[in-house]
Amino acid sequence: MAIITGNLVATELKFGIVCARFNDFINDKLLSGAIDTLVRHGASESDIDTAWVPGAFEIPLVAKKMAESGKYDAVICLGTVIRGSTTHYDYVCNEAAKGIGAVSLQTGVPVIFGVLTTENIEQAIERAGTKAGNKGSECALGAIEMVNVLKGL
């Protein structure tokens, strides 16, 4: 029986990051966490490209273009959606999640979901480098591992 695992070595891997501008005071921290983690695991900063989009809803299209380009081993999607007083939150969260998941399945490229979906600003801040760690960093680890798992198949 074969057991296939992915290591956390990012040397010579190329990463695309799609980051939403809306709620950038949170997303900047997610992006910094992702880049720092990729570099700490061997990626070169010159092998990391970041595309900024208006908001979480726009992430899937740019993620798809990056994944289809053949330039990237993985794409990391970062954003923050904070619940407000309308149903807009539900639509944005659902469509971003479905779109990002579909890109990975359609292209065969690991596309990592790093869009925070929180009830309030405090929860978002906690997940961007305080009490609950940095989800951008966690997504970078997931991207590295998935690339290496796929290489082992």
From Swiss-Prot:
Report the active site residues: H88 (proton donor)
Q: List the Pfam families hit by this protein, alphabetically.
A: DMRL_synthase (PF00885)
User: Which InterPro entries does the UniProt entry name for this protein?
Assistant: LS, LS/RS, LS/RS_sf
Which SUPFAM superfamilies does this UniProt record tie to the protein?
A: Lumazine synthase
Q: What is catalyzed by this enzyme?
A: (2S)-2-hydroxy-3-oxobutyl phosphate + 5-amino-6-(D-ribitylamino)uracil = 6,7-dimethyl-8-(1-D-ribityl)lumazine + phosphate + 2 H2O + H(+)
Residues holding (2S)-2-hydroxy-3-oxobutyl phosphate: S85, T86, R127
List the keywords (alphabetical). Answer: Riboflavin biosynthesis, Transferase
Q: What pathway, per the record?
A: Cofactor biosynthesis; riboflavin biosynthesis; riboflavin from 2-hydroxy-3-oxobutyl phosphate and 5-amino-6-(D-ribitylamino)uracil: step 1/2
Citing just one GO molecular function, the answer is:
6,7-dimethyl-8-ribityllumazine synthase activity
> Per the record, GO CC terms?
cytosol; riboflavin synthase complex
Q: What is its EC number?
A: 2.5.1.78
Q: Which PANTHER family match?
A: 6,7-DIMETHYL-8-RIBITYLLUMAZINE SYNTHASE, 6,7-DIMETHYL-8-RIBITYLLUMAZINE SYNTHASE DMRL SYNTHASE LUMAZINE SYNTHASE
Per UniProt, subunit arrangement is:
Forms an icosahedral capsid composed of 60 subunits, arranged as a dodecamer of pentamers.
* UniProt function note: Catalyzes the formation of 6,7-dimethyl-8-ribityllumazine by condensation of 5-amino-6-(D-ribitylamino)uracil with 3,4-dihydroxy-2-butanone 4-phosphate. This is the penultimate step in the biosynthesis of riboflavin.
Which protein is depicted? 6,7-dimethyl-8-ribityllumazine synthase
Provenance organism? Glaesserella parasuis serovar 5 (strain SH0165) (Haemophilus parasuis)
Q: Which gene encodes it?
A: ribH
